[in-house]
UniProtKB/Swiss-Prot annotation:
<dbReference type="InterPro" id="IPR013792">
    <property type="entry name" value="RNA3'P_cycl/enolpyr_Trfase_a/b"/>
</dbReference>
<dbReference type="Pfam" id="PF05189">
    <property type="entry name" value="RTC_insert"/>
</dbReference>
<comment type="function">
    <text>Catalyzes the conversion of 3'-phosphate to a 2',3'-cyclic phosphodiester at the end of RNA. The mechanism of action of the enzyme occurs in 3 steps: (A) adenylation of the enzyme by ATP; (B) transfer of adenylate to an RNA-N3'P to produce RNA-N3'PP5'A; (C) and attack of the adjacent 2'-hydroxyl on the 3'-phosphorus in the diester linkage to produce the cyclic end product. The biological role of this enzyme is unknown but it is likely to function in some aspects of cellular RNA processing.</text>
</comment>
<dbReference type="InterPro" id="IPR017770">
    <property type="entry name" value="RNA3'_term_phos_cyc_type_1"/>
</dbReference>
<comment type="similarity">
    <text>Belongs to the RNA 3'-terminal cyclase family. Type 1 subfamily.</text>
</comment>
<dbReference type="InterPro" id="IPR023797">
    <property type="entry name" value="RNA3'_phos_cyclase_dom"/>
</dbReference>
<dbReference type="GO" id="GO:0006396">
    <property type="term" value="P:RNA processing"/>
</dbReference>
<feature type="binding site">
    <location>
        <position position="103"/>
    </location>
    <ligand>
        <name>ATP</name>
    </ligand>
</feature>
<dbReference type="InterPro" id="IPR020719">
    <property type="entry name" value="RNA3'_term_phos_cycl-like_CS"/>
</dbReference>
<protein>
    <recommendedName>
        <fullName>RNA 3'-terminal phosphate cyclase</fullName>
        <ecNumber>6.5.1.4</ecNumber>
    </recommendedName>
</protein>
<dbReference type="GO" id="GO:0005524">
    <property type="term" value="F:ATP binding"/>
</dbReference>
<dbReference type="GO" id="GO:0003963">
    <property type="term" value="F:RNA-3'-phosphate cyclase activity"/>
</dbReference>
<feature type="active site" description="Tele-AMP-histidine intermediate">
    <location>
        <position position="308"/>
    </location>
</feature>
<keyword id="KW-0547">Nucleotide-binding</keyword>
<keyword id="KW-0436">Ligase</keyword>
<keyword id="KW-0067">ATP-binding</keyword>
<dbReference type="InterPro" id="IPR013791">
    <property type="entry name" value="RNA3'-term_phos_cycl_insert"/>
</dbReference>
Length: 342
């Protein structure tokens, strides 16, 4: 019988990522875990609908037994079974992030007995979670280099706080893992500005694009008008394609916040990324930790290791025989993964 891993949900940044990573790793390794103090660092601690959906999805996919799976719960015991591929559908029932639920269960399906399709309904454009276009255009090309083949499709947008969006991912079992080396970003090839509108006047998008164009040489710019019933909502994104990596940054518009202020937030974030030669942005770094750990080797550079990143690394090291080493040189942190030997 495998040992029970005890996790403190209050460690590090004390958010939901500790739970999501633990669920993924438990399904993959077969190791059960207990987590207490779930989301202790948040204003509203405990399981929200999004986190509960992730728990229920993980439970269904690996036929786990679970204790504490209810709204507001701050303690969970998860004992995984065998991961099985198939066609799965999960509904969050709020504007909670579809991509964060997918992020929880897809790694386990890389080890399933056959191909799978997972469809999640909820929020697609959420200020605190990566949108589907980030997964599709930034993360999945890097996963393919590691040997992980999955394809995400956004079927319907759902903006915070209403939700109603749908995202689906098709995934195949991994035959073998490759190592990923992301040392330098390289020269910028082109930059693309993109705005989504649903039930919002077009001039909002035009002003957002103008603000981006005032700071960066946009090679391409797009305005997408979505059906009104998918809103109201507005997201502005900027994609930076460099020689060795493509990064994408976004800001979700808010009521009573001007188009110029929304776009200026994005400009600030992109400038922070470009100020360093590091290849990987803050949010992508979080997404790379688990797949690169499963490969057992690799490295990437990031300007500043976030508390979120360090917390995620700590959880991964509890489940997998790997060690992460962080080395800072000239304002760039190199994150290196090595496999531990018995």
């Amino acid at each position: 019988m495998k040992r029970m891993i005890a996790l403190d949900g209050a460690q590090g940044e004390g958010g939901g990522q500790i739970l999501r990573s633990a669920l993924s790793l438990s399904m993959i390794t077969g190791q059960p875990f207990t987590i207490t103090g779930i989301r202790a660092g948040r204003a509203k601690p405990g399981l929200l609908r999004q986190h509960l959906t992730a728990v229920k999805a993980a439970t269904e996919i690996c036929r786990a037994t679970v204790e504490g799976a209810e709204l507001g719960s701050q303690r969970l015991v998860f004992r995984p079974g065998t991961v099985r591929g198939g066609d799965y559908r999960f509904a969050i029932g709020s504007a909670g992030s579809c991509t964060l639920v997918l992020q929880t269960v897809l790694p386990a399906l890389w080890f399933a007995d056959g191909p799978s399709r997972v469809e999640v309904s909820g929020g697609t454009d959420n200020p605190s979670a990566p949108p589907a276009d980030f997964i599709r255009r930034v993360l999945e090309p890097l996963l393919a280099k590691i040997g992980i083949h999955q394809q995400t499709t956004l079927l319907r947008h759902g903006f915070y706080p209403v939700g109603g969006g749908v995202v689906a991912t098709e995934v195949s079992p991994v035959a073998s893992f490759n190592t990923l080396q992301l040392g330098e970003r390289g020269n910028i090839v082109q930059m693309r500005g993109e705005v989504l509108l649903a039930g919002v006047p077009r001039h909002v998008a035009e002003r957002e694009i103008a603000t981006l164009a005032g700071s960066f040489p946009l090679h391409e710019q797009y305005i997408h008008n979505l059906p009104r019933d998918q809103g109201p909502g507005n997201t502005v994104s900027l994609e930076v394609e460099s020689e060795n990596i493509t990064e994408r940054f976004f800001v979700v518009g808010e009521k009573h916040v001007s188009a110029e202020v929304v776009a200026a937030q994005l400009v600030k974030e992109v400038k922070r990324y470009l100020a360093s030669p590091a290849a990987v942005g803050e949010y992508l770094a979080d997404q790379l930790v688990l797949p690169m750990a499963l490969a057992g080797a690799g490295q990437f550079t990031v300007a500043h290791p976030s508390c979120h990143l360090l917390t995620n690394i700590a959880v991964v090291e509890r489940f997998l025989p790997v060690r992460f080493t962080l080395a800072e040189t000239n304002g760039v942190t190199r994150v290196m993964i090595t496999k531990l030997t018995d």
